[in-house]
């Protein structure tokens, strides 16, 4: 699959600060929104400081990439959302209700995985987060749960939110004027920002 030079990114953010990891996932669709590519991710180990660790990465992405939206759990991310809104990115922030919409997100992720329409970056930490997650069938559909309570699954949850956003939203990516001195074009940009 060819990689776009200037992709539209759909972000999913699963926030935790004290005892659990925090994960940000970026995916991009193909031209027809039939397949999706895992463009990059950051997983922060606890304790996580949202203002000094997560916010700079989000601001860097919103400034230098075409971001269609950020799907996130509003319960833990109030400060992040307020700061991003103050910086003019409020229209790209989409709250995900953890009771109702996460079932939809899990169902969408399940469909893409079983239909082999999602390409993931080979990464041991990603593999671990996915292996520690399980899908539980409920009357509303699939729900993402932890197999072992002490193992993190935040990447899986963030991926599900990003996938849900990408499969629902089309044509919302905006982008400031491009400058080769200012903008980065690399699928590994998240690694360099998070370091």
Where are the language model's segments positioned?
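Short, surface-exposed amphipathic charged segments that create phosphate/polyanion-binding patches used
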Residues: 105-115
């Amino acid at each position: 699959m060819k990689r776009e030079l200037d992709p539209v990114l759909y972000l999913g953010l699963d926030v935790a600060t004290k005892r659990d990891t925090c994960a940000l996932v970026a995916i991009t669709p193909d031209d027809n929104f039939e397949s999706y590519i895992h463009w990059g991710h950051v997983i922060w180990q606890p304790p996580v400081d949202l203002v000094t660790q997560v916010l700079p990465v989000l601001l860097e992405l919103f400034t230098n990439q075409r971001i269609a939206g950020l799907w996130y759990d509003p319960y833990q991310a109030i400060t992040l959302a307020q700061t991003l809104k103050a910086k003019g990115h409020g229209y790209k922030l989409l709250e995900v209700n953890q009771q109702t919409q996460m079932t939809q997100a899990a169902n969408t992720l399940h469909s893409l995985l079983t239909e082999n329409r999602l390409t993931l970056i080979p990464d041991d930490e990603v593999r671990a987060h996915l292996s520690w997650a399980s899908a539980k069938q409920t009357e509303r559909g699939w729900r993402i749960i932890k197999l072992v309570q002490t193992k993190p699954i935040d990447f899986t949850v963030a991926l599900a939110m990003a996938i849900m956003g990408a499969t629902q939203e089309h044509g919302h990516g905006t982008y400031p004027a491009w400058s080769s001195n200012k903008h980065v074009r690399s699928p590994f940009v998240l690694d360099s920002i998070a370091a």
